[in-house]
């Protein structure tokens, strides 16, 4: 075993993965709960999908549960998704279920990858490709390049649909806002768990031609309430976006 063999294996495998994912059916930005669920259902439905995550780890806000207590809650309407993914839970009354946030995050990631979604971590989306009034791809760079402010030109990824799953900041939609292509991003409202969960799913939609918003990004775009450590809306939002996109792609 030589060190160069290890290096060559890593470089060749990653290069081939990246090359194979420069042209996609769907590019998802953000590997949080809604993004990974969307990736799972899209891949399962036969679409070519990749998820781009700027952080080193995937999972978004799942890991820390609530105030560091690594448990989260999911409501009855999303329980079937937990069952499909094989996540364990315990009923705590009123149609609520408590589960281990570590199991949830790791299982969502594993199931998405096993279904065929490719996850690229440490890759940040610095802009969008917009042609003829439609989002048609991503402008990507390494997260460390973005963090250090180095003047390094990016690469692009082509996609028939882009999904903004970047959470509270709706960071991908912000690129459209600053160009005047969408009118406003009100940001999320004060805490109201029940209404926030309901509206998260309701506002999961195509917010601009070629661009869907899911999860807390959808909430931020609609000015809907935040909901705290209940994650059913995130799961349902990802599934809803995936099924709508698959239908539009004729899958």
Curated annotation (Swiss-Prot):
Q: What does this protein do?
A: Involved in the biosynthesis of the thiazole moiety of thiamine. Catalyzes the conversion of NAD and glycine to adenosine diphosphate 5-(2-hydroxyethyl)-4-methylthiazole-2-carboxylate (ADT), an adenylated thiazole intermediate, using free sulfide as a source of sulfur.
NCBIfam families, alphabetized? sulfide-dependent adenosine diphosphate thiazole synthase (TIGR00292)
**Residues reported to bind NAD(+):** 34, 53-54, 61, 125, 151-153, 216
Quaternary organization: Homooctamer; tetramer of dimers.
Q: Name one GO molecular function term.
A: iron ion binding
The UniProt entry's sequence similarity note says: Belongs to the THI4 family.
Protein name, UniProt field: Thiamine thiazole synthase
Q: In which pathway does it act?
A: Cofactor biosynthesis; thiamine diphosphate biosynthesis
What domain of life does the UniProt record list for this protein's source? Archaea
Q: Per the UniProt entry, what are the Gene Ontology biological process annotations, in alphabetical order?
A: thiamine biosynthetic process; thiamine diphosphate biosynthetic process; thiazole biosynthetic process
Q: What is its EC number?
A: 2.4.2.59
Residues binding Fe cation, per UniProt: 153, 168
Q: Where does glycine bind?
A: 226
The coenzyme or cofactor needed here is: Fe(2+)
Species of provenance:
Thermococcus kodakarensis (strain ATCC BAA-918 / JCM 12380 / KOD1) (Pyrococcus kodakaraensis (strain KOD1))
| Reactions catalysed according to its record | hydrogen sulfide + glycine + NAD(+) = ADP-5-ethyl-4-methylthiazole-2-carboxylate + nicotinamide + 3 H2O + H(+)
Q: Which UniProt keywords apply?
A: Iron, Metal-binding, NAD, Thiamine biosynthesis, Transferase
């Amino acid at each position: 075993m030589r060190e160069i063999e290890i290096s060559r294996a890593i470089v060749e495998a990653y290069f081939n993965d990246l090359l194979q994912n420069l042209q996609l059916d769907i590019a998802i930005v953000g590997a949080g709960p809604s993004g990974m669920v969307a990736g799972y259902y899209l891949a399962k439905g036969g679409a070519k999908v990749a998820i781009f995550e700027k952080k080193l780890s995937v999972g978004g806000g799942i890991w820390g549960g609530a105030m560091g207590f690594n448990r989260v809650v999911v409501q009855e309407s999303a329980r079937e998704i937990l069952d499909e993914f094989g996540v364990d839970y315990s009923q705590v009354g009123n149609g609520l279920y408590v589960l281990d946030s570590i199991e949830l995050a790791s299982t969502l990631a594993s199931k998405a990858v096993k279904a065929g979604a490719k996850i690229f971590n440490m890759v940040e989306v610095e802009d969008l490709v917009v042609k003829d009034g439609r989002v048609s791809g991503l402008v990507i760079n390494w997260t460390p390049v973005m963090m250090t402010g180095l003047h390094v030109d990016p690469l692009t990824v082509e996609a028939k649909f882009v999904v903004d799953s970047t959470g509270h900041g709706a960071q991908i939609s912000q690129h459209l806002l600053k160009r005047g292509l969408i009118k406003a991003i009100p940001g999320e409202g004060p805490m109201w768990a029940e209404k926030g969960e309901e509206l998260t799913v309701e506002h999961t939609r195509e917010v601009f031609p070629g661009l869907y918003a899911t999860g807390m990004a959808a909430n931020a775009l609609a000015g809907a309430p935040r909901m705290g450590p209940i994650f059913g809306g995130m799961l349902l939002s990802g599934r809803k976006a995936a099924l709508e996109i698959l239908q539009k792609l004729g899958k």
